[in-house]
Each structure stands twice: as structure tokens, then as C-alpha cells.
């Protein structure tokens, strides 16, 4: 599918049918999503595919988001790793000498952790939010490419998600992504004309 066509096909899907979503299709979409760029190639994301605990997770969603999560066959909870130094070292450890030069291994094992140690809390938060946005957009496009609907949800009680899903506190919840099929005819949302958002200097 051409990129323009793919973007035009992507819509916020808020009502889902009972048709199940194949776990293999979800895994494929996540695998494609992780090809997204990330600052320093830090890849600070974690995906939790929620099926059995979806009803519990839905209780944390605000307003109409409750209905969306409740009706979705699958919800993907996207987390980011707040221990950036540990994440950098994990990349070096898992990738190993087969994928990295000695210089690159040094970069992930020592250079990056030293840089991350200088970040204040706000810098870490901004860093994680940016990288979460990059991979989330890739994920919904990957789902769209397989004919699967999705919606990005920001409105939920982030303070309780780790407990409900039994996820280590070091991981920060960023988004809930509801996933499934729909029989609704979805219309594109209004977009500002491109000349309204471009300035030249």
C-alpha cells in the first residue's frame, strides 16, 4: 500500500465488532512498529498486549474511553523505560558482537549511560514522550496496513496501570491503543490546509 493511501485509510476506530484479532497479526504490527526511529537508537518502549485483563484495564479509562477499551478485542498498553542507562546496556547485551562493532558496544555500554545520567526529570520525561509518539504512530499504521482498526487513548489513570497489569514501576505508561475490526464507515477528520502550518524564512 502506498504511504499516502495508508495514511488516508487510518482513522480513529472507536467501536469494534466481536471479530477476534489474530495474535500473530498483533505481533507483526509491533515488529513493524519497532522499525520507528528513536533518539540514540535507545528504543525505550515496551508493549503489553492485553486480552484477559482488558475489563480491569477499561476501569482505568476516563469517560467514553471506558467503552472503547471494554469493546476492543485487544488493547496494547505502551510503556517507556525510565531507566535509560539500563535500556542502553540491554541493547548492547542483546545485540552483542554479531550486530555491533566494539565502538558501538562502548557507545551503548558507557557513553550513553553517562549522557543519560546528566538528564533531569523533565528531560527524561520529554525524551520518553517523543519516542513513544514515534513508535505509536508506526504501530497504528502497521495495523491499518493489515486492515485492523485502532485508536490512541491518552485519557486513563496512569497511576494504576502498572499494578493492574503487573508491570515493573520502572516502566512508565504512555498510551493505550485499542485494536480490532469495525463495520463502521469512518470519515476523515478535518485537516488544516498545509499552507496554514508552513512558514518560510
What are these regions (language model features)?
Residues 1-201:
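Acidic, surface-exposed loops and disordered segments
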Amino acid at each position: 500500500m502506498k504511504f499516502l493511501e495508508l495514511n488516508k485509510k487510518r482513522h480513529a476506530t472507536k467501536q469494534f465488532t466481536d471479530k477476534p484479532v489474530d495474535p500473530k497479526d498483533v505481533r507483526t504490527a509491533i515488529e513493524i512498529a519497532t522499525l520507528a526511529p528513536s533518539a540514540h537508537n535507545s528504543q525505550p518502549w515496551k508493549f503489553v498486549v492485553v486480552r484477559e485483563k482488558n475489563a480491569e484495564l477499561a476501569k482505568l479509562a476516563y469517560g467514553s474511553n471506558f467503552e472503547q477499551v471494554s469493546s476492543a478485542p485487544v488493547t496494547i498498553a505502551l510503556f517507556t523505560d525510565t531507566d535509560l542507562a539500563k535500556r542502553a546496556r540491554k541493547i548492547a547485551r542483546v545485540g552483542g558482537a554479531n550486530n555491533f562493532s566494539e565502538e558501538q558496544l562502548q557507545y551503548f555500554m558507557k557513553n550513553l549511560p553517562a549522557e543519560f545520567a546528566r538528564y533531569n526529570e523533565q528531560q527524561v520525561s520529554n525524551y520518553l514522550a517523543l519516542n513513544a509518539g514515534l513508535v505509536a504512530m508506526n504501530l497504528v499504521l502497521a495495523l491499518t496496513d493489515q486492515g485492523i482498526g485502532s485508536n490512541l487513548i491518552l485519557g486513563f489513570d496512569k497511576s494504576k496501570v502498572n499494578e493492574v497489569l503487573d508491570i515493573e514501576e520502572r516502566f512508565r505508561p504512555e498510551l493505550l491503543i485499542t485494536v480490532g475490526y469495525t463495520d463502521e464507515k469512518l470519515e476523515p477528520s478535518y485537516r488544516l490546509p498545509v499552507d496554514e502550518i508552513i512558514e518560510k524564512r
